[in-house]
Protein backbone atom coordinates (compact mmCIF):
# COMPACT_ATOMS: atom_id res chain seq x y z
CA UNK A 1 0.00 0.00 0.00
CA UNK A 2 1.39 3.36 -1.06
CA UNK A 3 -0.24 6.61 0.09
CA UNK A 4 0.21 10.34 -0.39
CA UNK A 5 0.93 12.16 2.89
CA UNK A 6 -0.01 15.80 2.23
CA UNK A 7 1.15 19.01 3.86
CA UNK A 8 -1.18 21.67 5.29
CA UNK A 9 -1.27 25.43 5.56
CA UNK A 10 -2.71 27.61 8.30
CA UNK A 11 -4.66 30.21 6.33
CA UNK A 12 -4.96 32.10 9.59
CA UNK A 13 -3.96 31.37 13.18
CA UNK A 14 -5.24 33.42 16.12
CA UNK A 15 -4.02 32.99 19.70
CA UNK A 16 -6.50 33.69 22.50
CA UNK A 17 -4.56 32.97 25.68
CA UNK A 18 -3.37 30.05 27.77
CA UNK A 19 -5.25 27.17 29.35
CA UNK A 20 -4.77 26.19 33.00
CA UNK A 21 -2.43 23.45 31.72
CA UNK A 22 -0.18 25.99 30.01
CA UNK A 23 -1.25 25.27 26.43
CA UNK A 24 -2.21 28.06 24.06
CA UNK A 25 -5.83 28.32 22.95
CA UNK A 26 -6.31 29.20 19.31
CA UNK A 27 -8.57 29.40 16.31
CA UNK A 28 -7.00 28.36 13.03
CA UNK A 29 -8.19 27.65 9.51
CA UNK A 30 -6.43 24.62 8.04
CA UNK A 31 -6.07 23.80 4.36
CA UNK A 32 -4.52 20.57 3.05
CA UNK A 33 -2.43 21.09 -0.11
CA UNK A 34 -1.17 18.98 -3.02
CA UNK A 35 2.45 18.88 -1.85
CA UNK A 36 3.72 16.21 0.48
CA UNK A 37 5.48 12.94 1.23
CA UNK A 38 4.81 9.33 0.26
CA UNK A 39 4.34 6.52 2.78
CA UNK A 40 4.12 2.80 2.00
CA UNK A 41 3.19 -0.12 4.24
CA UNK A 42 3.50 -3.89 3.92
CA UNK A 43 3.43 -6.96 6.14
CA UNK A 44 6.78 -8.05 7.52
CA UNK A 45 8.48 -10.42 9.93
CA UNK A 46 9.49 -7.47 12.09
CA UNK A 47 8.69 -3.79 12.49
CA UNK A 48 10.88 -1.47 10.43
CA UNK A 49 10.96 2.07 9.06
CA UNK A 50 13.18 3.21 6.21
CA UNK A 51 13.27 6.90 5.30
CA UNK A 52 15.25 8.82 2.70
CA UNK A 53 16.29 11.14 5.55
CA UNK A 54 18.39 9.06 7.98
CA UNK A 55 17.70 11.47 10.86
CA UNK A 56 14.05 10.38 10.79
CA UNK A 57 14.86 6.68 11.18
CA UNK A 58 14.48 7.00 14.94
CA UNK A 59 12.06 5.86 17.67
CA UNK A 60 10.91 9.50 17.94
CA UNK A 61 9.32 9.42 14.48
CA UNK A 62 5.57 9.94 14.94
CA UNK A 63 4.84 6.92 12.73
CA UNK A 64 5.96 4.73 15.64
CA UNK A 65 3.55 6.59 17.91
CA UNK A 66 0.75 5.91 15.43
CA UNK A 67 1.59 2.20 15.50
CA UNK A 68 1.51 2.15 19.30
CA UNK A 69 -1.79 4.03 19.51
CA UNK A 70 -3.34 1.72 16.89
CA UNK A 71 -2.12 -1.40 18.67
CA UNK A 72 -3.31 -0.20 22.05
CA UNK A 73 -6.78 0.33 20.59
CA UNK A 74 -7.09 -2.77 18.37
CA UNK A 75 -4.80 -5.25 20.15
CA UNK A 76 -3.34 -6.15 16.73
CA UNK A 77 0.41 -6.59 16.99
CA UNK A 78 1.39 -8.04 13.61
CA UNK A 79 4.68 -6.46 12.46
CA UNK A 80 4.77 -4.08 9.50
CA UNK A 81 7.42 -2.45 7.34
CA UNK A 82 7.25 1.22 6.37
CA UNK A 83 8.98 3.24 3.67
CA UNK A 84 8.79 7.01 3.98
CA UNK A 85 9.89 9.36 1.23
CA UNK A 86 10.15 12.85 2.73
CA UNK A 87 9.63 15.98 0.69
CA UNK A 88 8.11 18.20 3.39
CA UNK A 89 10.96 20.02 5.18
CA UNK A 90 11.47 19.28 8.86
CA UNK A 91 10.35 22.08 11.18
CA UNK A 92 8.58 23.94 8.39
CA UNK A 93 5.17 24.53 9.98
CA UNK A 94 3.25 22.70 7.27
CA UNK A 95 2.46 19.52 9.18
CA UNK A 96 4.92 16.95 7.83
CA UNK A 97 5.20 14.80 10.95
CA UNK A 98 1.50 15.11 11.75
CA UNK A 99 0.54 14.14 8.21
CA UNK A 100 2.81 11.09 8.31
CA UNK A 101 1.24 10.03 11.61
CA UNK A 102 -2.30 10.42 10.28
CA UNK A 103 -1.44 8.64 7.03
CA UNK A 104 0.06 5.79 9.06
CA UNK A 105 -3.14 5.44 11.11
CA UNK A 106 -5.25 5.36 7.96
CA UNK A 107 -2.88 2.83 6.35
CA UNK A 108 -3.00 0.52 9.38
CA UNK A 109 -6.80 0.66 9.42
CA UNK A 110 -6.89 -0.30 5.74
CA UNK A 111 -4.13 -2.91 5.94
CA UNK A 112 -5.68 -4.81 8.84
CA UNK A 113 -9.28 -4.14 7.71
CA UNK A 114 -10.23 -2.97 11.19
CA UNK A 115 -12.94 -0.66 9.81
CA UNK A 116 -12.36 2.02 12.43
CA UNK A 117 -14.60 5.00 11.74
CA UNK A 118 -13.24 8.38 10.77
CA UNK A 119 -14.34 9.72 14.17
CA UNK A 120 -12.36 7.00 15.97
CA UNK A 121 -9.27 7.68 13.86
CA UNK A 122 -9.60 11.38 14.63
CA UNK A 123 -9.76 10.65 18.37
CA UNK A 124 -6.70 8.39 18.11
CA UNK A 125 -4.94 11.17 16.22
CA UNK A 126 -5.44 13.54 19.17
CA UNK A 127 -3.24 11.23 21.25
CA UNK A 128 -0.40 11.66 18.78
CA UNK A 129 -0.25 15.38 18.02
CA UNK A 130 -2.19 18.61 17.69
CA UNK A 131 -2.42 18.72 13.89
CA UNK A 132 -2.99 14.99 13.33
CA UNK A 133 -6.84 15.04 13.50
CA UNK A 134 -6.94 17.60 10.67
CA UNK A 135 -6.03 14.93 8.12
CA UNK A 136 -9.22 13.01 8.87
CA UNK A 137 -11.23 15.98 7.59
CA UNK A 138 -12.04 16.47 3.90
CA UNK A 139 -9.14 18.92 3.59
CA UNK A 140 -10.51 22.23 4.86
CA UNK A 141 -11.18 22.50 8.58
CA UNK A 142 -11.39 24.86 11.50
CA UNK A 143 -9.15 24.04 14.45
CA UNK A 144 -10.19 25.25 17.92
CA UNK A 145 -9.08 24.57 21.49
CA UNK A 146 -5.37 23.96 21.13
CA UNK A 147 -5.91 23.27 17.43
CA UNK A 148 -6.81 19.61 17.87
CA UNK A 149 -10.61 20.04 17.92
CA UNK A 150 -11.55 19.85 14.26
CA UNK A 151 -14.72 21.25 12.72
CA UNK A 152 -15.60 20.68 9.08
CA UNK A 153 -15.40 23.86 7.05
CA UNK A 154 -16.46 24.56 3.48
CA UNK A 155 -13.48 26.64 2.46
CA UNK A 156 -14.49 29.62 0.35
CA UNK A 157 -10.81 30.09 -0.55
CA UNK A 158 -10.63 27.14 -2.93
CA UNK A 159 -10.18 29.59 -5.79
CA UNK A 160 -6.86 30.57 -4.23
CA UNK A 161 -3.43 29.27 -5.18
CA UNK A 162 -0.44 29.22 -2.88
CA UNK A 163 3.30 29.69 -3.35
CA UNK A 164 5.56 28.19 -0.68
CA UNK A 165 8.92 29.55 0.44
CA UNK A 166 10.93 27.21 2.63
CA UNK A 167 13.79 28.07 4.98
CA UNK A 168 17.15 26.35 5.41
CA UNK A 169 16.68 26.56 9.18
CA UNK A 170 13.69 24.91 10.91
CA UNK A 171 11.64 26.48 13.69
CA UNK A 172 10.85 24.27 16.67
CA UNK A 173 7.24 24.57 17.78
CA UNK A 174 8.26 24.87 21.44
CA UNK A 175 10.50 27.82 20.58
CA UNK A 176 7.74 29.59 18.65
CA UNK A 177 5.35 29.36 21.61
CA UNK A 178 7.98 30.19 24.22
CA UNK A 179 8.36 33.69 22.73
CA UNK A 180 4.62 34.46 22.79
CA UNK A 181 3.65 37.53 24.83
CA UNK A 182 0.20 38.55 26.12
CA UNK A 183 0.04 41.40 23.61
CA UNK A 184 0.15 38.81 20.81
CA UNK A 185 -3.30 37.45 21.70
CA UNK A 186 -6.40 38.20 19.60
CA UNK A 187 -9.96 38.46 20.86
CA UNK A 188 -12.40 35.73 19.89
CA UNK A 189 -14.80 36.60 17.09
CA UNK A 190 -18.29 35.20 16.57
CA UNK A 191 -17.90 35.24 12.81
CA UNK A 192 -14.88 33.74 11.02
CA UNK A 193 -14.93 36.49 8.41
CA UNK A 194 -13.94 38.96 11.13
CA UNK A 195 -10.60 37.25 11.64
CA UNK A 196 -7.78 38.87 9.70
CA UNK A 197 -5.98 36.44 7.42
CA UNK A 198 -2.73 36.45 9.38
CA UNK A 199 -0.80 34.35 11.88
CA UNK A 200 -0.39 35.59 15.46
CA UNK A 201 2.67 33.34 15.88
CA UNK A 202 4.60 35.51 13.43
CA UNK A 203 5.12 38.08 16.17
CA UNK A 204 6.81 35.56 18.47
CA UNK A 205 8.82 33.79 15.76
CA UNK A 206 10.11 37.06 14.32
CA UNK A 207 11.53 37.93 17.77
CA UNK A 208 14.21 35.29 17.32
CA UNK A 209 14.15 34.76 13.54
CA UNK A 210 14.77 38.20 12.06
CA UNK A 211 15.68 36.53 8.78
CA UNK A 212 12.09 35.34 8.37
CA UNK A 213 10.74 38.80 9.12
CA UNK A 214 13.05 40.27 6.48
CA UNK A 215 12.07 37.53 4.05
CA UNK A 216 8.39 38.35 4.54
CA UNK A 217 9.03 42.03 3.81
CA UNK A 218 10.95 41.04 0.66
CA UNK A 219 8.12 38.76 -0.52
CA UNK A 220 5.55 41.50 0.08
CA UNK A 221 7.58 43.81 -2.16
CA UNK A 222 7.98 41.40 -5.06
CA UNK A 223 4.36 40.23 -4.89
CA UNK A 224 2.84 43.71 -4.52
CA UNK A 225 1.79 43.95 -8.22
CA UNK A 226 -0.51 40.93 -7.82
CA UNK A 227 -2.65 41.83 -4.80
CA UNK A 228 -1.23 38.79 -2.99
CA UNK A 229 -1.15 38.06 0.73
CA UNK A 230 2.07 36.89 2.46
CA UNK A 231 2.09 35.08 5.80
CA UNK A 232 3.68 32.29 7.81
CA UNK A 233 2.21 28.81 8.23
CA UNK A 234 1.93 27.28 11.69
CA UNK A 235 4.99 27.88 13.84
CA UNK A 236 7.16 28.44 10.75
CA UNK A 237 9.56 28.40 9.09
CA UNK A 238 7.57 28.28 5.84
CA UNK A 239 6.22 31.54 4.43
CA UNK A 240 3.56 31.40 1.75
CA UNK A 241 1.80 33.68 -0.69
CA UNK A 242 -1.88 33.34 -1.57
CA UNK A 243 -3.52 34.84 -4.63
CA UNK A 244 -6.78 34.44 -6.54
CA UNK A 245 -6.84 32.15 -9.59
CA UNK A 246 -8.86 34.87 -11.30
CA UNK A 247 -5.79 36.99 -11.94
CA UNK A 248 -4.33 34.19 -14.08
CA UNK A 249 -7.12 34.63 -16.63
CA UNK A 250 -5.24 37.61 -18.08
CA UNK A 251 -2.35 36.17 -20.17
CA UNK A 252 0.11 38.99 -19.52
CA UNK A 253 -0.58 38.97 -15.78
CA UNK A 254 -0.27 35.18 -15.67
CA UNK A 255 3.06 35.34 -17.49
CA UNK A 256 4.43 37.96 -15.07
CA UNK A 257 3.09 36.04 -12.07
CA UNK A 258 4.71 32.74 -13.04
CA UNK A 259 7.96 34.54 -13.82
CA UNK A 260 7.84 35.94 -10.28
CA UNK A 261 7.34 32.44 -8.87
CA UNK A 262 10.27 31.09 -10.89
CA UNK A 263 12.63 33.98 -10.13
CA UNK A 264 11.84 33.93 -6.41
CA UNK A 265 12.25 30.12 -6.22
CA UNK A 266 8.75 29.54 -4.89
CA UNK A 267 6.75 26.32 -5.11
CA UNK A 268 3.23 26.67 -6.54
CA UNK A 269 0.62 24.45 -4.86
CA UNK A 270 -3.15 24.10 -4.70
CA UNK A 271 -5.73 23.16 -2.10
CA UNK A 272 -6.51 19.45 -1.91
CA UNK A 273 -9.77 17.72 -1.09
CA UNK A 274 -10.22 14.13 0.04
CA UNK A 275 -12.11 11.69 -2.16
CA UNK A 276 -12.55 7.91 -1.82
CA UNK A 277 -11.19 7.61 1.69
CA UNK A 278 -7.84 9.39 1.47
CA UNK A 279 -5.98 12.23 -0.22
CA UNK A 280 -4.70 11.37 -3.68
CA UNK A 281 -1.98 13.28 -5.44
CA UNK A 282 1.35 12.23 -6.80
CA UNK A 283 2.72 15.01 -8.96
CA UNK A 284 3.75 17.81 -6.60
CA UNK A 285 6.69 16.05 -4.97
CA UNK A 286 10.19 17.42 -4.65
CA UNK A 287 13.38 15.40 -4.89
CA UNK A 288 14.77 17.10 -1.82
CA UNK A 289 13.42 18.55 1.40
CA UNK A 290 15.99 21.31 1.57
CA UNK A 291 15.16 24.40 -0.41
UniProtKB/Swiss-Prot annotation:
ATP binds at residues 89-99. The keyword Cell cycle does not apply. The active site is at 8, 131. GO terms for biological process: isopentenyl diphosphate biosynthetic process, methylerythritol 4-phosphate pathway; terpenoid biosynthetic process. Keywords: ATP-binding, Isoprene biosynthesis, Kinase, Nucleotide-binding, Transferase. The keyword Membrane does not apply. One of its GO terms (molecular function) is ATP binding. It comes from the Bacteria. It catalyses: 4-CDP-2-C-methyl-D-erythritol + ATP = 4-CDP-2-C-methyl-D-erythritol 2-phosphate + ADP + H(+). It is an enzyme of class 2 (transferase). InterPro entries: GHMP_kinase_C_sf, GHMP_kinase_N_dom, IspE, Ribosomal_Su5_D2-typ_SF, Ribsml_uS5_D2-typ_fold_subgr. It holds the Pfam family GHMP_kinases_N. Pathway: Isoprenoid biosynthesis; isopentenyl diphosphate biosynthesis via DXP pathway; isopentenyl diphosphate from 1-deoxy-D-xylulose 5-phosphate: step 3/6. Belongs to the GHMP kinase family. IspE subfamily. Catalyzes the phosphorylation of the position 2 hydroxy group of 4-diphosphocytidyl-2C-methyl-D-erythritol. This is 4-diphosphocytidyl-2-C-methyl-D-erythritol kinase. It comes from Chlamydia abortus (strain DSM 27085 / S26/3) (Chlamydophila abortus).
Amino acid sequence: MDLFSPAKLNLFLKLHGKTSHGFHEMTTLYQVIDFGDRLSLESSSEDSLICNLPELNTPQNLIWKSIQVFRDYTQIYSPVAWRLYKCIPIGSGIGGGSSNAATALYALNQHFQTQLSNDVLQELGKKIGMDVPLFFSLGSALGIGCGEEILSYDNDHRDERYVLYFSDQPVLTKDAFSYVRPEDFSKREECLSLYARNNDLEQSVFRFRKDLEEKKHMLKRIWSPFNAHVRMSGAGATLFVSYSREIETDPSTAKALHATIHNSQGLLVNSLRKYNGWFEHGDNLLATTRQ
